[in-house]
A protein has these predicted regions:
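Left-handed beta-helix
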Residues: 63, 68-69, 74-75, 80-89, ...
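Residues at secondary-structure transition points
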Residues: 29, 46, 68, 88, ...
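Terminal amphipathic alpha-helical/low-complexity segments used for targeting or macromolecular assembly
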Residues: 1-59, 63, 174-180
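Conserved beta-strand-loop-alpha-helix hinge in the C-terminal portion
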Residues: 159-178
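Extended, non-globular alpha-helical segments
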Residues: 51, 55, 98-100, 109-112
Length: 180
């Protein structure tokens, strides 16, 4: 069921996606999500962590997209032009999000301590090409992260952020220029 809703989202979102078979065969972001769902099941339900990690690395080899099987991903994540996308172990992604090429949802720390060290994206978040969201930060609902932006702090709902470091350029549909 999740696979069908993802394919439907791709068809609605990407003007180049003209029919379902094209999406199934030619979209590495869709392949990566199919693999993630299996690997996540192995990791979280069956506790076959080595096997899940091994399969996730095989998926990375074929798709260019690295999704840790320990990540929590909601419905209809569309990874478009996904080469170089990295999604870390404690990342949480809500429903209806879009990631473009080169996006990193990365962690801070070494992983020695079992704490949340990767970002949380709530629902309907678009992270543009090359953007980096680093650490245990929360990106609120209905957000746009501009290309090449570096986000190190929480981002409130209904806004657009750009820059290094990120700052707000649109909030609730109104142009602004505010620090995070």
């Amino acid at each position: 069921m999740e696979n069908r809703s993802l394919i439907k989202k791709v068809l609605e979102t990407d003007p180049a996606a003209r029919y379902a078979l094209n999406v199934i065969i030619n979209y590495p972001g869709v392949h990566a999500m199919f693999c993630y769902r299996i690997n996540s099941f192995l990791w979280k339900k069956l506790h076959l962590k080595f096997l899940a990690r091994m399969f996730s690395q095989i998926a990375r080899f074929f798709t260019g997209i690295e999704i840790h099987p320990g990540a929590t991903i909601g419905k209809r994540l569309f990874i478009d032009h996904g080469m170089g996308v990295v999604i870390g172990e404690t990342t949480i992604i809500g429903d209806d999000c879009v990631l473009y090429q080169g996006v990193t949802l990365g962690g801070v720390g070494t992983g020695e301590h079992k704490v949340k060290r990767h970002p949380t994206l709530l629902n309907n978040v678009m992270v543009s090409a090359g953007a980096k969201v680093i650490g245990d930060v929360t990106i609120g609902n209905n957000r746009i992260i501009g290309a090449q932006t570096v986000v190190l702090k929480d981002v409130p709902d209904n806004c657009t952020v750009v820059g290094v470091p990120a700052f707000i350029v649109k909030e609730n549909g109104v142009k602004v220029k505010k620090e995070l």
